[in-house]
Amino acid sequence: MLKEKTLTWFGVPFIKFPHDLIFYQKIIFETKPDLIIETGTKHGGTTLFLAHMLDLVSNGRIITIELNPGRKLKFYHPRITQFIG
């Protein structure tokens, strides 16, 4: 079993199996979504990964929702909007 902070994307921890990211990029490449809504930001690694995939297809933005006010994103990306609470 992997530890929670073992895997990172550009230095930001994410809690996913690495093969999940392959499926995410495939879906994003094929659909070029205008909007991705993510619930549960935690550290933001998956959020940042999704933003980078949207950069590659030149489309879309992400709204991420986190209930814990202590989990505000520690980075900025123009495609990401975070709501807390």
Regions found by a protein language model. Name each.
Residues 7-85:
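S-adenosylmethionine/decaboxylated-SAM
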Residues 1-4:
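N-terminal, positively charged/glycine-rich alpha-helical extensions of SAM-dependent methyltransferases
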